[in-house]
């Protein structure tokens, strides 16, 4: 007898025509209730960047995102090699 597949979470629907937002800079801030991540794109040699997207989430959601990113980056590095961090990154 086979077991029915367990649900893996909500069905994710991507709206038709949705454009991706490229970001090479993120700014993170928080309040007691929320974590705010601003994603921006900055060009080489520029001193300012325009925020392309702002994501506000609960601290729990941020921790779950951190866990998912950690797992996915580990898989990425296992497949493609270690990602080198620049010496001036924070």
Where are these regions (language model features)?
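Positively charged, low-complexity terminal tracts
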Residues: 1-90
